[in-house]
């Protein structure tokens, strides 16, 4: 088995255990297509004992907000976030899908009040596996494909 060689980052975040093929979506929802001069690395289809294949995203000079971690949980509920300081892992945690998703997802119902009024979107998690959420306002249930296209 070939060894994966990736340059270490001094400060930043490593998102590991992303299901294979979803790393680009993580980069997209975090608006990282143009990093602030730091390293942005996507390793795709890397061997994983846990998942078989996985993606890894390394972001130099960026630490994730709670909202960003919640977004990642909707795309990659198996992901692990590593906070790197002075070339070492200072903190490590698994993402968790919150019970309520507030302000980060649009309702797929074009007639929903959240798409026409100045109200913050709000969804309740109905199921984590498979992922399903229900809109607080119109009660529409959305499944993973709709969730991903409305982030």
Curated annotation (Swiss-Prot):
Cofactor dependence is on: Zn(2+)
Give the co-factor note: Binds 1 zinc ion per subunit.
Q: Which GO terms describe its molecular function?
A: metal ion binding
Superkingdom, natural source: Archaea
Q: Which GO terms describe its biological process?
A: 'de novo' pyrimidine nucleobase biosynthetic process; pyrimidine nucleotide biosynthetic process
List the keywords (alphabetical). Metal-binding, Pyrimidine biosynthesis, Zinc
Disulfide pairings = none
Q: Does this UniProt record's set of keywords contain Zinc?
A: yes
List cellular component terms (GO): aspartate carbamoyltransferase complex
Q: Which InterPro entries match?
A: Asp_carbamoyltransf_reg_N (IPR020545), Asp_carbamoylTrfase_reg (IPR002801), Asp_carbamoyltrfase_reg_C (IPR020542), Asp_carbatrfase_reg_C_sf (IPR036792), Asp_carbatrfase_reg_N_sf (IPR036793)
Q: Does the keyword Metal-binding apply?
A: yes
- Which residues are recorded as binding Zn(2+)? 107, 112, 135, 138
Q: Which family does it belong to?
A: Belongs to the PyrI family.
Q: How does the annotation summarize its subunit structure?
A: Contains catalytic and regulatory chains.
Task: Name the HAMAP family on file.
Answer: Asp_carb_tr_reg
Q: What does this protein do?
A: Involved in allosteric regulation of aspartate carbamoyltransferase.
Question: Could you tell me which NCBIfam families the record lists for this protein?
Answer: ATCase_reg
| Name assigned to this protein | Aspartate carbamoyltransferase regulatory chain
Lineage, uppermost ranks? Archaea, Methanobacteriati, Methanobacteriota, Thermococci, Thermococcales
What gene is behind this protein?
A: pyrI
């Amino acid at each position: 088995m070939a060894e994966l060689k990736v340059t270490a980052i001094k400060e930043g975040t490593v998102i590991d255990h992303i299901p294979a093929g979803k790393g680009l979506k993580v980069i997209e929802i975090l608006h990282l297509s143009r990093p602030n001069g730091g390293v942005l690395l996507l390793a795709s289809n890397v061997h994983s004992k846990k998942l078989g294949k996985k993606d890894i995203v390394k972001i130099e000079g960026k630490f994730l907000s709670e909202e960003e971690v919640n977004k990642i949980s909707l795309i990659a509920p198996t992901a692990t976030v590593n906070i790197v300081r002075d070339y070492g892992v200072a903190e490590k945690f698994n993402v968790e899908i919150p019970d309520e998703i507030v302000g980060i997802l649009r309702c797929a119902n074009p007639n929903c009040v959240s798409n026409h009024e100045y109200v913050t979107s709000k969804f309740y998690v109905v199921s984590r596996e498979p992922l399903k959420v229900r809109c607080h306002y119109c009660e529409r249930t959305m499944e993973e494909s709709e969730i991903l296209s409305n982030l």
